A protein has these predicted regions:
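Active-site glycine/GP-rich loop and adjacent strand/helix microenvironment
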Residues: 1-131
Length: 131
């Protein structure tokens, strides 16, 4: 079966049942939520949701956020609080991620964060809307 889950494996950990299979540490997200951007030298670069989420950990004061990829060159970031300083720092973190991974930095648009009141069971912070 193919479930499209992105998994984090437990390093050097044996299964408690005694089987010699690989142990999962956690489910990191869905393959559908992996962003794909054009690489600087051609080709594509896959960017996993946790890589994008980490960009927000380094920005002081961010209480809530959601990132949507709408195309190869456009991200929409919903963030609270939406201040000039937060926008500059988030943009710098995302540009740094692009530089480290070697993809063309997308245009980043900012919107105020509004809590999602739809029927979703699990809140998504990183979502690929361009599929």
């Amino acid at each position: 079966y193919r479930l499209n889950d992105v998994l984090t494996l437990a390093a050097n950990q044996a299964c408690g049942c005694g089987q010699a299979t690989t142990v999962m540490a956690k489910i990191a997200g869905r393959e559908d939520d992996v962003f794909s951007f054009p690489a600087v030298g051609g080709g594509r670069v896959s960017v996993f949701p946790d890589m994008v989420e980490r960009c927000f950990l380094y920005v002081p004061g961010v209480s809530e956020f959601r990132v949507e990829r709408h195309s190869d060159d456009r991200l929409v970031v919903f963030v609270a609080p939406l201040t000039g300083e937060v926008m500059d720092q988030v943009r710098a973190e995302l540009d740094g991620l692009a530089g480290r991974l070697g993809f063309v930095p997308p245009r980043v648009e900012f919107e105020p964060y509004v809590a999602d009141s739809t029927h979703r069971r699990k809140r998504k912070r990183v979502e690929n809307c361009a599929q």
